[in-house]
């Protein structure tokens, strides 16, 4: 099968061409910090699939390897993860997971309940703000902004210039450039970023309360069977942990607290999230925790989260 340079319009699902000469049946181009990469890594672990991991730095984790010529040959959209099966690329994480589920049926729980909660925990649409009432994933994406600021502040302006010029999504590139230039001041009182974060948190409270109620007398979202929905919420809850928000929910929602405890004790949590951590992620989360106490507008933002009771 001949190699072919993919076109942007083709980049959904499995393609018929190859983009690599790897001897490995499965290859995953991923990033340690990316939520979508974490989801696919966990799926591969739960399916017990041997794969070759190829780490690609994105600007949050100190570099722009996703904008390199070599990676753009793999994915012109410059996004991770990309899963290769026999060197044929599968684009978009939800399509990669669907492909795994179709290739290895009945290994993870499947039901209407799984579909509902998996979608509820996903980032849906091109504009996260428009979906915050329906999708917890959209809320968590917007609440990750303070962590982005913490992780990006040591990235050189030269790299940011390169990032802005080359990144195919100018909206994302502009937002991240603002994080680097303005720092936590993007969360000043009544600023657009502050208002969006507060709205996202208000809607996330409703999603978390609903999940807590659903988990009554259940081990996993679909009862006794671990599923893709649990993988989705594993990554979301851990991201809330990274942004110093998860305890607001687990201190008051007992079912959610016990559920997160079970998720953290699963082998795939340790092997696919914790063991794939890095100094950049560690220092970013550590600095954010410290900055919440030291930076007045950031402290005010987090105080507003904590002062609003759960529904």
Model-identified regions with their sequence ranges:
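C-terminal or late-domain output modules
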Residues: 1-33, 38-49, 58-67, 197-311
């Amino acid at each position: 099968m001949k190699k072919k340079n993919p076109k942007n319009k083709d980049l959904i699902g499995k393609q018929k061409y190859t983009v690599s000469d790897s001897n490995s049946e499965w290859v995953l181009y991923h990033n340690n910090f990316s939520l979508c990469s974490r989801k696919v890594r966990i799926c591969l672990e739960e399916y017990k699939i041997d794969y070759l991991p190829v780490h690609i730095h994105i600007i949050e984790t100190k570099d722009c390897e996703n904008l390199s010529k070599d990676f753009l040959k793999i994915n012109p959209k410059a996004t991770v993860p990309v899963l290769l099966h026999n060197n044929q690329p599968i684009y978009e994480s939800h399509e990669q997971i669907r492909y795994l589920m179709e290739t290895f049926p009945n290994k993870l729980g499947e039901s209407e309940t799984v579909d509902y909660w998996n979608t509820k925990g996903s980032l849906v649409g091109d504009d996260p703000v428009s979906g915050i009432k329906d999708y917890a994933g959209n809320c968590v994406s917007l609440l990750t902004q303070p962590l982005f600021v913490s992780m990006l502040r040591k990235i050189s302006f030269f790299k940011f210039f390169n990032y802005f010029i080359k990144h195919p999504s100018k909206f994302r590139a502009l937002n991240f450039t603002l994080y680097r230039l303005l720092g936590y001041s993007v969360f000043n009182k009544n600023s657009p970023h502050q208002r969006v974060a507060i709205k996202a948190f208000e809607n996330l409270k409703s999603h978390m309360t609903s999940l807590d109620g659903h988990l009554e007398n259940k081990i996993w979202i679909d009862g006794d069977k671990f599923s893709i929905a649990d993988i989705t919420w594993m990554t979301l809850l851990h991201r809330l942990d990274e942004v110093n928000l998860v305890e607001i929910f687990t201190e008051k929602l007992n079912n959610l607290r016990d559920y997160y405890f079970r998720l953290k004790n699963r082998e795939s949590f340790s092997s696919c999230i914790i063991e794939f951590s890095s100094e950049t992620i560690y220092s970013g989360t550590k600095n954010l925790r410290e900055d919440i106490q030291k930076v007045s507008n950031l402290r005010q933002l987090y105080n507003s989260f904590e002062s609003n009771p759960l529904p």
